[in-house]
Amino acid sequence: MSENLNSEKEFVQEQYKKLLNEVKEHGNVLITHIGELSQNVISVLESEVEEKVTGLELAKGPVKKIFFISVETLQNMLIHGHKGNAGEQQNFFILLKTDSCINIISANLVANDAIHTLEKQIHVINSFDDEKALKAYYLEHLESNTMSDKGGAGLGFITIAMKSANK
C-alpha cells in the first residue's frame, strides 16, 4: 500500500471518527459505513436504510425521500469519488435520526483539481431559495446534455437538493 493511500485512508478515518463522535451527541445513529463502496455494498446499505427507515413509523413520502437521497448519495460516491493509484476509494456514510429530522451524512475524497468546480456547483445549487427556480435549473442542466468524464450530467446534487428541500 502506498504512503499516499495510507495517508488518505487515515485522513478519512480520522474525519469519520470525529464526526461520528459529534453526531452521536445529537441523535441516534441508524446506519454507518466506512470504507470502499461497490454495487454489492450499496445493495446491502440500501436494504439497511429501507429496514431502519420503515421501522421509524414515518409517513410513506419521507421514507421514499430518505431512501432516494441515500441511494443517490451512495451512487455518487461510488461513481465520482476520487480513486487512489491502487483504485481504492475512501468513503463514509452515516444515517442519523435526531428529534426533528433524519440526517444523511456522507464524505469521499475529491481530486484536488476538481475541488473548485465542485464548490462552485454546490454554491449555485445552495443559492436557490425557490423550488421552481431550482427545478428550472435542473431542466436547463438536463437539456444541455453536458457529460462529465465519468459519465455524469451533474444532476445528482441537484436532485438531492430538490428531494430534500434542505440543502
Spans of features found by a protein language model:
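Short, contiguous, helix-prone interaction/anchoring segments in small proteins
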Residues: I34-I42
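Active-site Tyr-X1-5-Lys
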Residues: F11-Q15
